[in-house]
């Protein structure tokens, strides 16, 4: 017997927990000093592997005269493990579908960002994501691939360390546009990596909610390699920043009120983490984060504290991991849009601002959310005799949010000057319990089979109660003192059980075939539908510098909570008992919407410095839920859901990453670019149009297409003068006017390194082919007097002679600016310099100045939303009035600008150092 040590080739540190496998499976795991024992006389080939390192195969006999084995860290990008399915993680070369992996392990040291969208938008092919408006804490709108669905639920599933994250937006005391995003609770600096699964071909294993894709977030863990297990790794990161109005308003006669309304929003952030390895293969990670961020809208401010503790234990065949995160937040979300008494509307509509509410009354109001969140998991695994690996994960995400709205006594809002107060209490929780068994079988020379069976139980609960009170007798806002009170309660529970089986074939580490089947049962599907099945299949074949992949999968979207069951509402009591009337007529046969996706792609590596990836996909959605109107003569009101809708979609994703120039480790130029094309078309609606004009779902057109009467020309009086009251003549027919999704979008950028220490980077985003319903300008043009374009036209008309060609031309222009919907469905193409980044590595100087107490230091400066070039005349070409996505029964609306707050320009300076 002979002891051998496994070390990191770059640092010489021992690797704790490296796995040594032979023909019969796992034979050993390295101890706390990196050692394992081997029989030198055994003529077998051993495989030594560890996550993040290139595996190495070596004959046991050759170790007689060798005391160490060096593993190469990150030598082959394809060996980085990414999420292959809900039950497995594999190297990129084994995947038959395109899963994007974003490594953020160095983000804490190199730069600063507050949002998940800043990280992923433009870096992941087939995905577009942005905040619904420019205030702090706003929801994110996701556009995933072709968007071939009629549903308003368009968010992907999000998992954080295996815990199903509750990403429900909260708008209990304000409008949906000003909702509080659940993603605000993510501590960005804690994230180690993100895997993005974009469609059913890869997401089928996640079941009946994964048609929008899945985002897998893995947070940082304790270090596993530490010389002599004495030293902890300590990181401290400090950020100061400011936000300002990025694009000043110039579309109105009086722009000063709007431009002067927005403020400079100051922000500061502190992040620190400690990582430590202990004996007996144990590690610990702790982090603390403080964010204090003010937005450009007065009163918009987010103060958030978070702490995380992670513990890992590895001992031969047994591993244990536990994570606990706590987040406390206090955020003020002043309401600026979508209402008569909101700020931006009152400054936009008239040349004399604040016509409907005094500015002092708006500023006196407050909308505040306090939230507490706990996210935790416990993960266990054990390798049984026979190399059967059992794994179990229990995850919990519990969130309590209290909202308080106040209108102080004495301020006039509408006809109320006696004050108002609303209080909401919301408790959201997600629980998931996963149990998995897997075993690897050696079938023949170079042929292995891994079989996996996984059971997943998920429970999601949402309970909300609120009370709204108004008209207090004095300056005391105790709820009991109000003369008018309204109480609201709601509850929601979703229970899902999924069973997933998977078979994975590996031939010669070149050909990989994966087949899976998921069975789901849920309380949201009809009582006559026992369960739903979702199959998947993928193939990957690797040549030396090229990979071909093909994948097919199916997934779904669950029905609305009331779709499956008939409900009644109590309407009083009679001598014979309660009086009830119908509320919703459910469908006991209702099923989840089903999306099928086939994906083909190829990846190339060119001269080891360039990678190119091409993906083609087609999506086919069936069983989309259409709500058919009920007859009141039958005793019902409203509508009943049926699975009759169909949508087709397809797209292309092209990605490039490369190093154009490198001189040792001193100079380099890395570039990246991606281009996405996507389209969809409704093919069946059950023979009817589903309308929320100007958005419609109509056969032959994109989902949520803009479809409405066009403007034929100006309206004239009998004397030939322009009729300013009528404005224009609308066509009797409807016409297609655009779609809410871009046909082409993507990003490009570079990272330049000079003299080893200096870095310069950029990210540019672009989109072509999308339209926005500019409801802001639509309303101002007909209800106010402040739209500059129309005012200039009216002034020019007054100086022209009736009946002349000049007069008629101006009248034609006025017809195109009149308050008609078709006039304000506008193109929203853009090119945006999203990020400009400068950094300098001060590590050498820091070690010298502190005598190696500080071993790393970096300073960076970043500007986000530097400028945008666009043909959209509104505040910003990336806005969403409904707050992103939401659970909604029936058709909603997409791509509407209803006095959305514009996105700010943000400046941040960051100093980070490690001890």
Which sequence ranges carry the predicted segments?
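Short, acidic, small-residue-rich periplasmic hinge/interaction motif at the N-terminus
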Residues: 5-23, 49-53, 63-108, 223-224
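Conserved small-residue
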Residues: 237, 241-255, 642-648, 662-740, ...
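Short acidic/polar hinge/loop motifs at secondary-structure boundaries
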Residues: 37-39, 163-198
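N-terminal periplasmic "start-of-domain" segments of outer-membrane beta-barrel proteins
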Residues: 21-35, 83-110, 137-141, 169-176, ...
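Surface-exposed loop/turn segments flanking beta-strands in extracellular/periplasmic regions
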Residues: 249-257, 338-360, 404-421, 461-489, ...
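Extracytoplasmic gating/loop element in the C-terminal half of outer-membrane beta-barrel translocons
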Residues: 767-858, 863
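Extracytoplasmic beta-strand/coil segments of soluble accessory domains associated
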Residues: 118-166, 193, 203-223
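Flexible loop and strand-edge segments within Gram-negative outer membrane beta-barrel domains
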Residues: 240, 267-289, 293-300, 304-374, ...
């Amino acid at each position: 017997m002979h002891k051998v040590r496994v070390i990191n080739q770059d640092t010489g540190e021992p690797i704790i927990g490296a796995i040594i496998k032979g023909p019969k499976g796992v034979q050993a795991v390295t101890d706390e000093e990196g050692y394992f024992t081997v029989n030198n006389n055994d003529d077998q080939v051993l495989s030594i592997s560890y996550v993040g390192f290139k595996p190495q195969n070596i004959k046991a006999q050759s170790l007689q005269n060798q005391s160490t084995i060096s593993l190469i860290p990150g030598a082959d990008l394809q060996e980085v493990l990414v999420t292959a399915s809900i039950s497995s993680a594999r190297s990129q070369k084994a995947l038959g579908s395109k899963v994007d992996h974003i490594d953020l392990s160095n983000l804490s040291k190199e730069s600063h960002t507050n949002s998940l969208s800043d990280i992923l938008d433009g870096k992941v092919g087939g995905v577009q994501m942005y905040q619904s408006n420019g205030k702090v804490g706003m929801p994110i709108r996701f556009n995933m691939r072709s968007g071939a669905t009629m549903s308003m639920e368009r968010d992907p599933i999000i998992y954080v360390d295996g815990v199903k994250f509750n990403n429900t937006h909260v708008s209990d005391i304000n409008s949906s546009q000003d909702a509080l995003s659940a993603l605000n609770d993510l501590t960005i600096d804690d994230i180690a990596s993100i895997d993005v699964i974009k469609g059913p071909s890869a997401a089928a294993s996640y079941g009946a909610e994964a048609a929008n894709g899945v985002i897998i977030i893995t947070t940082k863990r304790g270090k596993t390699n530490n010389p002599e297990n004495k030293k902890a790794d300590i990181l401290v990161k400090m950020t100061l920043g400011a936000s300002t109005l990025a694009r000043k308003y110039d579309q109105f006669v009086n722009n000063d009120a709007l431009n002067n309304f927005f403020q400079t929003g100051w922000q500061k952030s502190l992040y620190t983490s400690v990582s430590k390895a202990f004996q007996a293969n144990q590690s610990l990670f702790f982090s603390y984060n403080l964010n204090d961020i003010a937005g450009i809208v007065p009163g918009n401010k987010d103060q958030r504290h978070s702490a995380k503790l992670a513990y890992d234990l590895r001992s031969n065949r047994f591993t244990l991991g536990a994570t606990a995160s706590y987040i406390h937040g206090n955020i003020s979300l002043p309401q600026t849009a979508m209402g008569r008494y909101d700020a931006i509307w009152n400054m936009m509509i008239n040349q004399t601002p604040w016509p409907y509410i005094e500015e002092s009354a708006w500023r006196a109001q407050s909308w505040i959310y306090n939230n507490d969140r706990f996210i935790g998991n416990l993960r266990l695994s054990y390798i049984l005799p026979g190399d059967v690996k059992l794994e179990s994960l229990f995850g919990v995400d519990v969130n309590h949010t209290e909202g308080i709205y106040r209108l102080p006594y004495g301020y006039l809002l509408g006809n109320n000057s006696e004050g108002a107060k609303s209080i909401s209490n919301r408790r959201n929780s997600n629980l998931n319990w996963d149990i998995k068994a897997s075993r690897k079988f050696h079938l023949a020379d170079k042929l292995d089979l891994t079989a996996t069976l996984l059971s997943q139980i998920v429970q999601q609960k949402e309970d909300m109660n609120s009370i709204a009170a108004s008209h207090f007798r004095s300056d005391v806002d105790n709820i009991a003192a109000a003369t008018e009170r309204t109480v609201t309660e709601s509850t929601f529970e979703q229970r899902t059980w999924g069973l997933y089986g998977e078979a994975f074939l590996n031939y010669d580490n070149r050909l990989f075939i994966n087949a899976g089947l998921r069975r789901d049962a849920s309380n949201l599907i009809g009582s006559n539908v026992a369960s739903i099945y979702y199959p998947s299949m993928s193939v990957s074949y690797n040549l030396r510098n090229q990979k071909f992949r093909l994948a097919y999968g199916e997934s779904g979207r669950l029905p609305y909570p009331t779709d499956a069951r008939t409900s009644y509402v109590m309407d009083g009591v009679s001598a014979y008992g309660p009086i009830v009337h119908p509320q919703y007529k459910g469908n006991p046969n209702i099923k989840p919407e089903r999306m099928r996706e086939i994906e083909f792609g190829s990846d190339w590596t060119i001269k080891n410095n360039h990678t190119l990836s091409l993906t083609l996909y087609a999506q086919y959605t069936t069983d989309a839920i259409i709500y058919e109107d009920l007859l009141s003569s039958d005793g019902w009101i409203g509508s009943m859901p049926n699975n009759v809708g169909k949508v087709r979609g397809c797209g292309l994703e092209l990605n490039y990453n490369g190093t154009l120039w490198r001189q040792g480790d001193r100079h380099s130029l890395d570039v990246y670019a991606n281009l996405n094309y996507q389209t969809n078309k409704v093919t069946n609606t059950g023979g009817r149009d589903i309308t929320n004009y100007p958005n419609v779902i109509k056969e032959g057109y994109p989902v949520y297409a803009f479809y409405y009467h066009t403007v034929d020309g100006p309206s004239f009086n009998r004397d030939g003068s322009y009729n300013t009251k009528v404005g224009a003549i609308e066509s009797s027919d409807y016409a297609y006017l655009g779609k809410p999704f871009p046909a082409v979008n993507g990003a490009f950028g570079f990272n330049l390194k000079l003299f080893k220490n200096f870095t310069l980077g950029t990210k540019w985003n672009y989109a072509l082919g999308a339209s926005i319903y500019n409801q802001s300008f639509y309303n101002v043009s007909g209800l106010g007097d402040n739209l500059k374009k129309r005012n200039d036209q009216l002034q020019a008309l007054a100086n022209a002679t009736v009946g002349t060609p000049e007069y008629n031309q101006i009248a034609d222009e006025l017809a195109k600016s009149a308050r008609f919907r078709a006039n304000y469905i506008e193109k929203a193409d853009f090119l945006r310099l999203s990020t400009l980044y400068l950094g300098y590595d001060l590590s050498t100087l820091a070690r010298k100045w502190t005598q190696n107490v500080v071993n790393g230091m970096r300073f960076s400066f970043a500007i986000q939303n530097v400028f945008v070039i666009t043909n959209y005349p509104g505040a910003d070409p990336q806005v969403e009035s409904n707050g992103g996505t939401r659970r909604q029964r029936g058709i909603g609306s997409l791509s509407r600008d209803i006095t959305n707050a514009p996105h700010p320009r943000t400046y941040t300076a960051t100093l980070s150092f490690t001890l």
